[in-house]
């Protein structure tokens, strides 16, 4: 679509009067007679809401969304026909806050990363009964003020709202045309809107040691708090602070870094009600000062991109069920227009490594196809700009600012797993959805990433052989327990070479699917060459990996880096390491997703169960034992004595309690315990083969694939040792390959089945 309207903004005087208050635009509109259809198209430098006579036209949040603004900006389309019925005059208004464009962004902790001025572009398209059309667009006839009730709005810091202010009585001035830089491409909405979802009532209302009211909403989340209706005096001030934990009988906010996560509401006389519009917080607990709270006048809403829930998992052990709930909670909390690392501190960036590890788990639980295709398109754009896949996407404009800090200075460094998001994420989306367009969209990006890995692995450094990637800054086995940052990065030559091989294999498979036979052969040969180099460099003939560690053993087994005769020794070494640690895992971000499958797929199902059911630190169930309601960034974010981990083994204050990377274990819950794994993309053909361990008596899984909902439940037979009953449903147009209770593999077409 081509806009004929003008970009509008505030004059310099408006910005001087209030650098932090949202812009508020308005225009009186007189409608022609016989309007049959009305549509608003809108976008902004910032984040906006549009109103007709003070009625918000959409329930979405944070439009136009976060894209790589150096390259493109989304616009939205709203059908407002029903809102204009019976109207001949109305006030068209828009509120515009900083958002990602001019607001403070993570890692750099700077404002105005993409630009210094907010601006709005909008058109109202009217279709009359005679078929004629009229367009009313933003232009010099609009007015602007910053004297509205919302005095401040920031993703990290929250909002300040003064209910005593009536916007209709504010002092408006004429807008000015915005003539600055705008993103070169305006594109229709590519992703899915962010919306409010589950409402949470207080689970507990209590006081801290100073008598300040605290509220526990029962689980960690990304969301906002609504207050009201409640009666107050004019000028009464309500202050709400958000945090993930209570420590020493006080709300803990130390891990927020510089983010304030605070709502300040100044009351009008009488009945008050308030819901923020331009921020969200990461929290389970809040402190409230300035009002009497009850279950009736305060609640919280989870906020995340509007994706359909398509997967479920349940079993006989409530701790594992809580682990699954934690996985889904952190998925939702960190899918707020882009896949972020965390929803609470002053970061909230699109970290590529986190989603690379977590994508298969995410794709099972939610329909992430549209969400991820939008983000992947930006990944390809950033990759093209800087020549590599960076640590974060969108870039926070580090492309044009390399001086802010360590992350900006090293933005164009290449990193295994983080960079491999270019291959792993589109592959996971394609496998789950069967949507080949994601591979078509991303193929050049996928191929370019493997070529980058190839170039870096060919750099001779300290006499390293070809195809072994040792060059450059690497995060390595990030956050592996019992180690520090130097240890994590020292693991990189093993893990980066492993992911290099894996990505080459994915590109080969992708090329074959897309009919690019020459590329398929080229990258298949590269995969085998890198595997050979890995074995020649790191692996002894019997399969022992020199200076091996859990993550590299897991990757070597899962990525087929070893010869068949080497696998038994590698498996034995992995098991020995686990036993040496007292049946504890030792993996960081790069290996955790593959660890249990490396055991169970080599026949060590019970050993995998034993590791999953470990409940002392480090383990998946340790946070559950501590009462966690979301996935943690570190295995030991909370120490056994109940205090926050304040260690200095990484970036300062890096302790999030809502971080999905280690939740990647979910994929093993669904595919091995639940037994459901795909054979063909989109589950056109799927496998049902539960891996049954002694700790569970039943497990059930369901997944809504493009053809219908697959269900599978197994339950042990109390009367027969090793016996169990298998109930499953095969949707129309699909085929199931089932490992039956008698151990024989059979195929089933659509229908419901019970096997014993």
Positions of PLM-derived features:
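Carbohydrate-binding surfaces of carbohydrate-active enzymes
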Residues: 10, 508-524, 603
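Amphipathic, well-ordered alpha-helical segments in soluble domains
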Residues: 354, 375, 418-425, 503-506, ...
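Non-catalytic C-terminal accessory modules of carbohydrate-active enzymes
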Residues: 112, 116-119, 123, 136-166, ...
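Alpha-helical support elements that line or immediately flank enzyme active sites
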Residues: 39-42, 224-242, 278, 354-382, ...
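C-terminal capping/lid segments that line or modulate ligand- or cofactor-binding pockets
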Residues: 92, 160-162, 346-347, 352, ...
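Extracellular/oxidizing-compartment recognition motifs
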Residues: 1-345, 353-354, 368-373, 386-394, ...
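Active-site acid/base region of carbohydrate-active enzymes
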Residues: 47, 139-141, 145-146, 295-326, ...
